[in-house]
Structures are given as C-alpha cells and as structure tokens.
Amino acid sequence: MNKNIHFVSADEAVKVVKSGDHIHFSSVASAPKVLIEALCRRGDAGELRDVRIHHLHTEGQAPYTDAKYEGIFFHQAFFVGGNVRKNVQAGYADYIPIFLSETQKLYRSGALPCDVAMIQVSTPDKHGYVSLGTSVDATLAAIECARVVIAVVNKHVPRSWGDAMIPLSMIDYFVEDDAVLEPAHFSEPSEIEKAIGINCANLIEDGATLQMGIGAIPNAVLAQLGNHKNLGIHTEMFAD
C-alpha cells in the first residue's frame, strides 16, 4: 500500500455529500459497499434530503432504494438489475433508458450532474496510478466531472489497463477496505427459460457471431450452444 495516501474512514468521507447532490457509484463487482453503508447511515440519521444516486448494475444489496429512504435517496438507474427491479416498479427508484455506450455522455455533456463519485479501485502502482478494475463504463466520466471523488482502495480489485488506469491526483478521499468483491449471482433457469433457450439456440447457425445480454434468458441460450461450431463473439459482456 502506498504510504503517501492519507486514508479516512467511510463515515468521514461521505460527510462531503450534501442534500440535493447527485452521486455516482461504480458498478457490478466494484460497487463501493463500505461507502454505500456509510451513506445510508447518514440517511438513517436524517442528515440528507433529495440525494440522487446513479449507476449501472451493482452486485449485492441496494439499500438506498428501500421505501424508508423516500425523500432522502432516489435512485435513477442506467440498468435495472435484480437488486433494484422491485423498487423501480414500486416507484422508489427510476430508470433512465440509455445505451451502455452513451452513459459517459450523460456526465460529459452536463445533461446529468455528478457532484460526488464513489468508486472502488486497486492498490496503487509505483507510478502513482490505480485501476478501476471491473468498472470503467460511466465511472471514468463521473470521475472527470465530479466535484468530489471518493475511492475505496481494495487489494482484491484486479488491475485492468487502458482507460481503467487513473492517477491518484484525480481522487480526493481514500478509504481502505479489503472486503472480497461481490460475485455475480446466477439462479438456475426455470423450465420456461430453458425452453426459450432451446428454441433460440435452434435458430443460431454454425459460424454465427453472438452478442449476448445479461440475465437468465441469455444464459439459457448459451447453455444450449455446446454442440455448435465456429461461433464468434462480438459483445460487451459474456457470462461464464
């Protein structure tokens, strides 16, 4: 760990959040759980109002979408995952329909404010850079546009390269947490989903190029492709 980094507690870091702020969370396995928990404690204490929370899918719980935080937190999702779907349907969260490739434009164009970016990063290298690991997507643009950037430094975050590498100078507050990253959660497909998977797989010819989405149906289709040949992949994600 870089000895030049000054760490603060999660509770200390989230004090920078003000009522009316727009917050971005890094996504999927990189969701900054320790910061989310600290932010919810501020909500429980009645210290915040009308805070907007934005992110793509996150693994794990999304407590800020709970009905008890009505008027305190409101989640506007770029992707409606299983952990927020019921609360979106109930009206305690909302969905911004947008292509994944366009999410960064929301922040960079100013169409969507970003006051605080809460992210999770790798430990720093000898050059003073950390990696965004499993979550670049809209997170890089959020970091560039935010008033304040809070980073959880976690030794379990993998060091991915390219646009994922950012200098320590882009981060305002550092919080240390070595919790194991949240894995992807997959349920066994239902009989209906299996049937859909079989029907779809029968339409796919050998040599086809695949673009896969996220969820039970794409996984059910993939499970039926074991005997296909020369399949290509051109996709933003691909499940196990």
Please place each PLM-identified region on the residue numbering.
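Conserved alpha/beta enzyme-core scaffold
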Residues: M1-D240
